[in-house]
């Protein structure tokens, strides 16, 4: 099916598709897709996707409120599953989780059957705080290697409920992905835990009741937290937790969160 132009409009929001072809309910080809949407009367998306030798996505605004989940998303209904191409992304402003702002986000990469297999990107949180994301694909061993560094931690930890209440810190996340299984290491430096029920639960499991009370009150400072984790479909297992701070050292293993 070939459609020269298809427009959807609701109030100020609009979606315009040009030169689009469908095959088996999926997009097989397109020229341009223009997206402009509003949330609570404020513009939250304004960008254009162009498809030529490579797919280019450029815009002034992009809503990535579910950034962490988006990076790990596995969707059998991916509309771009027919595409294997180089990709270039350039957004002036991105809204990430917890209403943080990421500016001047640029990405070069490649998708295979609609999924990223290669990424090199950088964004600016302001005040000399940056986000770097890289992904490499090992075709021989059928593995992907994902690495994320961020000077701002909270927007990237929203997928993990036990990090609620974490303040400050710098984050380094590395993961080896093979099919539906990922083995990852998360390292956070120089942060504080304040009113964090999930972290309090972990401290209680380690028989550190007094420090758990402190984490609920004035807060608990850490120099380093390292977590080795394994995720298989919806099951998350924390294989090892090492936390070091001025008044605490914790080593745990085997905590499971589904």
Description of each model-found segment:
Residues 1-236, 241, 245-258:
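Membrane-proximal interfacial segments on either side of biological membranes
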């Amino acid at each position: 099916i070939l459609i020269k132009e298809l427009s959807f409009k609701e109030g100020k929001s609009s979606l315009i598709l040009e030169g689009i072809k469908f095959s088996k309910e999926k997009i097989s080809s397109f020229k341009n897709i223009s997206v402009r949407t509003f949330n609570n009367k404020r513009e939250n998306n304004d960008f254009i996707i162009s498809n030529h030798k490579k797919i280019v996505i450029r815009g002034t605004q992009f809503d990535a409120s579910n950034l962490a989940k988006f990076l790990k998303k596995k969707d059998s209904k991916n509309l771009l599953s027919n595409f294997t191409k180089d990709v270039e992304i350039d957004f002036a402003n991105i809204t990430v989780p917890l209403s943080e702002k990421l500016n001047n986000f640029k990405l070069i990469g490649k998708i295979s059957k609609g999924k990223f297999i290669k990424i090199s990107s950088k964004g600016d949180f302001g005040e000399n705080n940056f986000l770097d994301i890289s992904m490499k694909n090992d075709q021989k061993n059928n593995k992907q290697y994902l690495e994320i560094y961020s000077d701002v931690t909270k927007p990237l930890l929203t997928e993990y409920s036990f990090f609620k209440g974490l303040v400050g810190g710098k984050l380094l996340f590395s993961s080896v992905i093979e099919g539906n299984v990922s083995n990852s290491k998360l390292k956070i430096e120089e942060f504080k835990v304040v009113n964090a029920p999930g972290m309090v639960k972990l401290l209680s499991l380690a028989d550190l009741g007094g420090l758990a009370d402190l984490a609920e009150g004035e807060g608990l400072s850490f120099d380093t937290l390292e977590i080795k984790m394994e995720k298989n479909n919806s099951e998350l297992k924390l294989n090892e937790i090492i936390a070091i701070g001025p008044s605490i050292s914790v080593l745990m293993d085997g905590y499971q969160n589904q």
